[in-house]
UniProtKB/Swiss-Prot annotation:
It comes from Bacillus cytotoxicus (strain DSM 22905 / CIP 110041 / 391-98 / NVH 391-98). It is an enzyme of class 4 (lyase). Its cofactor is NAD(+). NAD(+) binds at residues 12-14, 33-34, 36, 38, 76, 95, 117, 148, 152. It catalyses: UDP-2-acetamido-2-deoxy-alpha-D-glucuronate + H(+) = UDP-N-acetyl-alpha-D-xylosamine + CO2. Optimum temperature is 37 degrees Celsius. This is UDP-N-acetyl-alpha-D-glucosaminuronate decarboxylase. Keywords: Carbohydrate metabolism, Decarboxylase, Lyase, NAD. Belongs to the NAD(P)-dependent epimerase/dehydratase family. The keyword rRNA-binding does not apply. Activity is completely inhibited by NADH but not by NADPH. PANTHER family: UDP-GLUCURONIC ACID DECARBOXYLASE 1, UDP-GLUCURONIC ACID DECARBOXYLASE-RELATED.
Amino acid sequence: MKKRCLITGGAGFIGSHLAEELVKRGHPVTIVDNFYKGKSKYHEELTGNIPIIPISILDKNSMHELVNQHDVVFHLAAILGVKTTMEKSIELIETNFDGTRNILQAALKGKKKVIFASTSEVYGKGTPPFSEDDDRLYGATSKIRWSYAICKTLEETLCLGYALQGLPVTIVRYFNIYGPRAKDGPYAGVIPRFIRAALQGDDLLVYGDGKQTRCFTYVSDAVEATIAAMDEKVNGEIINIGSEDEKSIQEVAQDIHQLTHSSSKIVHVPFEKVYPHGFEEIPNRKPDVTKLKEMCQFHPNVSWEQGLKETIQWFREIEND
């Protein structure tokens, strides 16, 4: 059955890929996005004549009206990123929590399905692999880098509270998604930052010793898993979306350096030279994807090398525009 889908943050990295895939599958899609970080060239790439409504999720009346016009809400809109968290923690907490509350309040009236985009950050300083029901351990309140994780945890709790009131909601926790259209500015994730540097001949800056590990998931795989969360059998569930393939940040830099045939150097930089006071690095982050496999019958399709090549190619193309 085709569903009318509303995607908050749908002009962003994951949201834009999700919108296009839903349209391909025959679902009518509407995007809500306030272009918090500005418009990018890739917004011109969006296919399928998808309407984009440029409003904030804090606009309660507009969001209530839009939610009621749709069957499913993919709530991806958020202020995010470690550096943004460090510099704009108040704005982040107020926007993310209040926006999510607006969505849930609107959805409850008509029992609209909500897929809430959370993050692997909520696992804090625990020991991987992280399972959805694991306890959390965060740093001291003075460590501002945890404000995003704590806010997302509170939003998850709010989602589950609404689930107890009968709202069909599923929480998905993303683990390091990468691919074409990923942000490549000063607040970029490590992969787009490395690719941009490699293509421009700049140093690839590895923070710390580079031994910290992450599990990277190509965006089309993340989208496939997110769409699977529409199924009513995962209502009220929390599901990790990620890969089990661990890579050290040093390995990531080396692989990108090799695939781009770059003349750049790989340079190590202490964390304290990059982030303000209150930063705390997480050495390892790996998901337990048992629930993803069993409840969503999902397995990644895109290999690490293939995903990197496609991402690099996209960055080459926008460099030449």
